[in-house]
């Protein structure tokens, strides 16, 4: 890996994308195709939830240092085989750490039992998962990572818990987080981004919603769900009412993690590329909007959970290396912001 193209710690230079992979769209889309480069062997475990549902967790157990455990919360429609999960778990294994990817409800390949699914602000689910992991691993140091909406849930939970989160997690990293859900959804619902991204996610979200409409006899018009082509339409029809929100705007406003950043009490890295197609730079927080425990890092490029590095065809080592370095380093200063020009 070319060190000029990857930032291994806060104190050194920012991430730079390879010359052969320009632009946020290419950096986002291309990274998905590199998942097969990382071989990971998981052990699946099923947990029953307090509300009589279930979630599946995929564990990486073969580690020399069982005292450190990374918990990775995946992004929208993600799972343990997503490119960022495989690359991070492979790198964690190299470091001798254990890892686990809890699947949000319905994301492990099997539909969950209840009407409810998962949503961008489901910090209660994060709370239950992390507390149970800590209870089952009382002698392990827990490090949490959230990707995209998994990062939004994690940051919201960290803010809600404040300093008490330190009883459960040592440190946290949120990557490519849609910190302002209103801004993110608005960004993705128009133009080329609607075609590239909203359509991609809705391709799987719509069938899942339709299955729940039938299974639970919901008073929702299936034709309207099939016809939804934006996040606003889909969240207005399904996500918001199913999870107790008035509409999409109410859901996005109440679930955004950005207002919680100034309440976080454990060392947390917020890493967002400035060319992330999912969030405009105007929605990124400033240093005075976050607590002293939060480090903001906004490299000029990287796309949405891209951060490819090296010569063609590239590698995904940069992001997991950055995450693990943050987890193992001593912060030299508080509330540090790094923005590349």
Please state what every model-predicted region is.
Residues 2-7, 135-242:
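Alpha/beta-hydrolase-fold enzymes
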Residues 24-64, 308-310, 314:
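N-terminal cap/lid segment of alpha/beta-hydrolase-fold proteins
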Residues 78-90, 281-283:
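The serine-hydrolase catalytic nucleophile loop
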Residues 81, 89-113:
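Conserved alpha/beta-hydrolase
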Residues 91, 107-143:
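Catalytic nucleophile-loop/oxyanion-hole region of alpha/beta-hydrolase
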Residues 264, 270-272, 276:
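Short beta-strand/loop motif that positions the catalytic acidic residue
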Residues 300-341:
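Catalytic active-site module of serine/aspartate enzymes centered on a nucleophile-bearing elbow/loop
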């Amino acid at each position: 890996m070319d060190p000029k193209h990857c930032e291994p710690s806060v104190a050194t230079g920012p991430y730079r994308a390879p010359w052969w992979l320009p632009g946020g769209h290419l950096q986002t889309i291309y990274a998905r195709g590199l998942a097969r480069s990382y071989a990971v062997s998981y052990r699946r475990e099923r947990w029953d939830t307090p509300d009589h549902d279930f979630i599946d967790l995929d564990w990486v157990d073969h580690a020399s240092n069982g005292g450190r455990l990374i918990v990775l919360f995946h992004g929208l429609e993600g799972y343990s085989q997503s490119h960022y999960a495989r690359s991070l778990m492979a790198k964690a294994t190299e470091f001798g750490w254990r890892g686990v990817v809890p699947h949000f409800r319905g994301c492990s390949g099997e539909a969950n039992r209840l009407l409810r699914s998962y949503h961008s602000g489901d910090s209660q689910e994060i709370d239950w998962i992390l507390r149970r992991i800590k209870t089952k691993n009382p002698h392990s140091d827990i490090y949490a990572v959230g990707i995209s909406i998994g990062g939004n849930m994690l940051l919201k939970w960290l803010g809600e818990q404040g300093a008490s989160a330190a009883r459960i997690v040592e440190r946290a990293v949120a990557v490519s987080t849609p910190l302002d859900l209103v801004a993110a959804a608005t960004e993705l619902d128009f133009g080329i981004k609607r075609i590239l991204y909203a359509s991609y996610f809705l391709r799987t979200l719509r069938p899942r919603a339709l299955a729940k409409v039938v299974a639970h006899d919901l008073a929702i018009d299936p034709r309207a769900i099939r016809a939804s082509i934006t996040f606003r339409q889909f969240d207005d029809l399904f996500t918001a009412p199913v999870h107790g929100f008035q509409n999409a705007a109410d859901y996005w406003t109440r679930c955004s993690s950005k207002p919680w950043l100034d309440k976080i009490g454990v060392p947390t890295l917020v890493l967002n590329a400035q060319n992330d197609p999912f969030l405009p730079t105007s929605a990124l927080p400033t240093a005075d909007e976050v607590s002293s425990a939060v480090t903001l890092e906004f490299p000029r490029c990287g796309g949405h959970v891209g951060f490819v590095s090296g010569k063609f065809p590239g590698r995904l080592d940069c992001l997991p290396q950055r995450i693990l370095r943050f987890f193992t380093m001593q912060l030299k200063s508080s509330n540090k912001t790094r923005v590349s020009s």
